[in-house]
């Protein structure tokens, strides 16, 4: 079985602007987008995030070029990913990725199908009264039915917007780190992430050892600049979606 890239994430607590400055992001090019997540309407009315709890994320990103809709399974099992979804592929306007997702609180597998769209095409699906499911096309629907057939996209509501500010490839020691700040529902988060790609000489053990070293280096580099890492068990998607659902209830 092919080795998979590892995305390593650390979350930051406290003053996001101060953390960005301490990590060297000031003056660098930024990408600002607005993000919506689709959730079960009835569940959100009770402050619940049923789609997320079933391991499915539907994320709309608007304001980039292109805009995009991502259908992600996280966590998932490799055995779930069947047929054409058993291996990564790119077929414009689609990109399909399978990655290991590591954080301080665990390691999971994630599979995501990203569909790029022209600016403005997705706006109606996330507008008040809109139906996010109308933006899910045949390939994304096939992905869900093949890999998580118990999940139904009926009665959805768009939760958001979340303001996302992303700064890519910030040099931190000998690493190029992506920084992304999220702001919504009275919450502000910052995530720092790197990717570790398999090398030709890697086996599973070598890749894991290299990723573990990188994970330690990332945490140490962030903390060495006076930035406090989060000790909360939830990732940023869980925290922000829960807050948005509670605000809807």
Regions found by a protein language model. Give the residues of each.
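Phosphate-end processing signature that detects enzymes handling 5′-triphosphorylated RNA
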Residues: 1-249
């Amino acid at each position: 079985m092919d080795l998979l890239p590892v995305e390593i994430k650390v979350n930051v607590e406290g003053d996001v602007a101060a953390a960005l400055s301490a990590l060297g992001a000031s003056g660098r090019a930024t990408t600002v987008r607005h993000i919506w997540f689709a959730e079960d309407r009835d569940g959100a009315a009770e402050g619940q995030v049923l789609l997320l709890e079933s391991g499915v994320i539907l994320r709309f990103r608007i304001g980039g070029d292109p805009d995009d809709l991502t259908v992600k399974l996280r966590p998932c099992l490799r055995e779930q990913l069947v047929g054409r979804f058993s291996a990564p592929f790119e077929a414009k306007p689609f990109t399909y990725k399978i990655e290991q997702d590591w954080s301080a609180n665990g390691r999971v597998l994630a599979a995501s199908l990203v569909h790029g769209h022209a600016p403005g095409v997705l706006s109606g699906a996330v507008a008040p009264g809109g139906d996010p499911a109308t933006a899910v096309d045949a390939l994304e629907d096939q992905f869900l039915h093949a890999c998580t057939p118990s999940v139904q996209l009926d009665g959805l509501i768009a939760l958001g917007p979340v303001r996302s500010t992303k700064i890519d490839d910030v040099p931190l020691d000998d690493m190029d780190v992506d920084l992304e700040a999220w702001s919504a529902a009275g919450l502000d988060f910052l995530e720092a992430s790197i990717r570790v790609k398999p090398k030709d000489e890697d086996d599973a053990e070598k890749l894991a050892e290299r990723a573990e070293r990188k994970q330690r280096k990332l945490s140490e580099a962030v903390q060495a600049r006076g930035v406090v890492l989060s000790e909360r068990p939830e990732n940023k998607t869980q925290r922000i979606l829960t807050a948005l659902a509670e605000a809807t209830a």
